[in-house]
Amino acid sequence: MALSAKLTLDKVDLKGKRVIMRVDFNVPMKNNQITNNQRIKAAIPSIKHCLDNGAKSVVLMSHLGRPDGIPMPDKYSLEPVADELKSLLNKDVIFLKDCVGPEVEQACANPDNGSIILLENLRFHVEEEGKGKDSSGKKISADPAKVEAFQASLSKLGDVYVNDAFGTAHRAHSSTVGVNLPQKASGFLMKKELDYFSKALEKPERPFLAILGGAKVKDKIQLIKNMLDKVNFMIIGGGMAYTFLKELKNMQIGASLFDEEGATIVKEIMEKAEKNGVKIVFPVDFVTGDKFDENAKVGQATIESGIPSGWMGLDCGPESIKINAQIVAQAKLIVWNGPIGVFEWDAFAKGTKALMDEVVKATSNGCVTIIGGGDTATCCAKWGTEDKVSHVSTGGGASLELLEGKILPGVEALSNM
């Protein structure tokens, strides 16, 4: 799947066309008020481009939360998003109380020129995800004939399909793979994601460094194996480092995370790294806590001293910070997935914060730096570095699957150039 070969919005003739666009308006809400409008703002360039280039209408569809196929307008309606869009675009936005069916089809068939229409939450229908729950909470699967009808109804709402929701591209849902129109293009947000990930996965600049953190080795096996075929260096930190250090150095790790299942793969991973000439770097010293708690007593440890019984490693220490900085300084391309300490707590945030500072410095020296979404993106938000790295991904799960070498159904479904 060549990411760089997919049809993009700027290559589509939109004049007089109705555009149906999958966006990611899954925004945090409190009492029906939007608490962070970042995802709505991120979709504006694609919407504006359509209107500026003569599109007849832009019909927007999204999910919000996990209603599991049950209509819950009191809790998960997209209506507040319509109001937010109005103020961001300074244009009227028509909100429809459903996303499919005769009334929706009629409203979208021949709207006024330049109309912006927002559909109600796609996940109020079990046919969007293909599975959900009934009113008693029992898991159910959607009837295939009804899924087909749902997709056919969505397909009637536009002449051109645009997907600008990278965050759901790893899901084969009706709105990501089931809209059947002759032209299916990526929006600008999706294009930026695909451009950056193709830089890393198709023709990487070298030296190429992957920084992998997180808790369990077994959750990252596929990621580690795939990246070992691409990178020159790999920093392994976070909770999963303790499984490696116990297996490889027989280090005493106290009550630190140990992943029994992941431990069985360590030897195979190291053999692959050696065969591919990849240098893997582990922490050599640690900041420890006497419990998993923000107010834990804080201690220090090294590989030689080990971590005492009952204590756990929650961050890397000053020596490791220095080593990480030296590796980062050599790289021309960096992909970072997963923090290397419990960054939410100040006592155990130094390792991740120091690494972030080095990655920012590398970016200003011309290194391309890509932050996989999820927790690492949260680190960027916490320390205000979103604009100081090359790219912060908007999709945690989607970016992880790409880096694991998987094909994303929502990208696969787009037209080729």
UniProtKB/Swiss-Prot annotation:
Testis and sperm. Localized on the principle piece in the sperm (at protein level). Testis-specific. GO terms for molecular function: ATP binding; metal ion binding; phosphoglycerate kinase activity. It comes from the Eukaryota. The keyword Metal-binding applies. InterPro entries: Phosphoglycerate_kinase, Phosphoglycerate_kinase_CS, Phosphoglycerate_kinase_N, Phosphoglycerate_kinase_sf. It catalyses: (2R)-3-phosphoglycerate + ATP = (2R)-3-phospho-glyceroyl phosphate + ADP. AMP binds at residues 215-216, 220, 239, 313, 344. The modification N6-acetyllysine is found at residues 11, 48, 75, 86, 97, 131, 146, 199, 267, 291. Disruption phenotype: Mice display greatly reduced ATP levels in sperm, severely impaired sperm motility and are infertile. No alteration in testis histology, sperm counts, or sperm ultrastructure seen. ATP binds at residues 215, 220, 239, 313, 344, 375-376. Mg(2+) binds at residues 215, 219, 375. Its cofactor is Mg(2+). CDP binds at residues 214, 219, 238, 338, 340, 343. The modification Phosphoserine is found at residue 4. Its EC number is 2.7.2.3. GO terms for biological process: flagellated sperm motility; glycolytic process. ADP binds at residues 214, 238, 343. Belongs to the phosphoglycerate kinase family. This is Phosphoglycerate kinase 2. It comes from Mus musculus. The gene is Pgk2.
